[in-house]
Amino acid sequence: IDKEDKGKEVIDKEYIHSKGQYFTKHESLQKCVIDFILNKPKLILEPSIGRGDLVNCVSDKLNVEFYMCEIDENIQLLDGIDRNKVLYCDFMKIKIDNNFDTIIGNPPYVKTKKGNLYIDFINKCFNLLNDNGELIFIVPTDFFKLTSAHKLLSEMISVGNFTHIYHPNNEGLFEHASIDVMVFRYCKDNSSEKITLYNNETKYLIESSGLITFSDTKINMDNKLSDYFDISVGMVCGRESVYRNEELGNIQLLSNKDTYTKYIYIDKFPSKDDKINEHLL
C-alpha cells in the first residue's frame, strides 16, 4: 500500500468509526436474522440499510417488500438494492405513520451524550411495532447492562419478551472493528412466560429495574432479600487492629444490630490530634 492508499485507509476507518457503519457481511449474522423472522410480514422496516446486506439476504429467502432508510447517500449500494426505493434521511428525525409486524437492522454504534445511538434506534423501532410484532437487531452485548438502556428495557419487558438471542462470542465479525455483538429477537407480546432461546438453549429471562440476566432455572422475583435477611452496608478499613480503637476512635460505625464500634478517621496525616498521630506511627 503506497502512502496515498494508506492515508485513504486511515480516513476511511475514521469515517466508519465516526458513523458507526459496520456492515453485516458475515453469513452467520445474516442467517440468524433470517431464522429469527417468525412472523409472516408483507413489509419489513430496515431503518439503517447501509449497503443493503440484510435486505439482500432476506429478499433471497422471503417474498417481502422493504421500507428502507439510510442517512449516508455516499454508501455504494449492493447490486439488487433499488436506490430509488431508499429513503435517505435521519431515521431518528422522521415521522413514520406505519407500524410494522417485522423490523430488522444493524443500527449504528455511536456514543452519544445519553448513551449510544443504537439504543435510540431500538427505542424508536420498539414504538413502531404492531402488537405481536418482532424486532430483530444486531447490537453490542452491553445493551442488557448499560444504565442508559435500563428504562427502555424495563418498558420493553413490561409488554413483551426477548424470545431469541444468538451470541456468537466472536469479536471479529465486522471489518475494521472488534465488537462483541448479539442478535436478538424481541416480540411485543406479553401473554407468554419470559423464556428465551439463548444460543438454542432454554433460559429464563430475569428483569430487575431494567437489568437483564438469564438463568437456567426459574427464579421467583416476587420476594426480596430483605424478606429473609437483615441487610447492612459493610465497611472495610484495611487494618482493623490499627483503626478500630475505642479510646482514640472519632467516628462510630454500626457493626451489628444496635451495636456501634469506634474507628479512627483522618483525611490527612499528621492530623490535629497528637495521640492519634503517635498511635498511627
Segments the model singles out, each with a brief description of its role:
Residues T217-L281:
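Polybasic, glycine- and aromatic-enriched phosphate-binding surface used to engage nucleic acids
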